[in-house]
Amino acid sequence: MTVKKYFSTFLAGTLLATGFVSVAQAGKSDDTLNVAIDRELESIDNYYNTAREGIVISRMVWDGLLYRDPKTNEYLPNLATSYKWVDSKTIEFDLRKGVKFHNGEKFDADDVVFTLNYLADPANGAKPARNVNWWINAEKLGEYKVRLNLKKEFPAALEFLSGPVVIYPND
């Protein structure tokens, strides 16, 4: 078989094999996320899982306070509408109104304070600890306003708040 004939056969086979592939779409009414992976996960809880697949699935389900734009590397609002550094160890967040969790619970400062204070307690065993061991606590300043108190200056705070630190409902 000549190279040209081999290439033509290969190309035709590839087109046939991929021409009948369709994208998976979830129905709006079934509230189910189907994901195919090659192993069983111990958990899809973002804070008790270190498997890459679990982290990817978690990112499909949960959001953080901030989002880092991959093109500009700018930290943008996500569950927070804005943030400001009060000093080198204190960040305040104004939170987005009108957000609901998957369980129908309204998102507010109680959820952020619950999540961040739960994670600040080493007894709860969040993995990996380096993602969450850099703050002391979170305080509720209003229904949609939160203060995060850091242990010391932490230049990567916004990166962590836009990545591995996601917010859970307090129920």
Question: Where would I find each of the regions flagged by the language model?
Answer:
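Surface-exposed binding/hinge segments that line
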Residues: K84, R130-D171
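Aromatic- and charge-enriched surface segment that lines or borders ligand/interaction sites
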Residues: T81-G125, L141, R147
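Immediate post-signal peptide segment of exported/extracytoplasmic ligand-binding proteins
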Residues: Q25-N34
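Solvent-exposed coil/turn segments that connect beta secondary-structure elements
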Residues: D38-L41, N49, P70-K71, S88-K89, ...
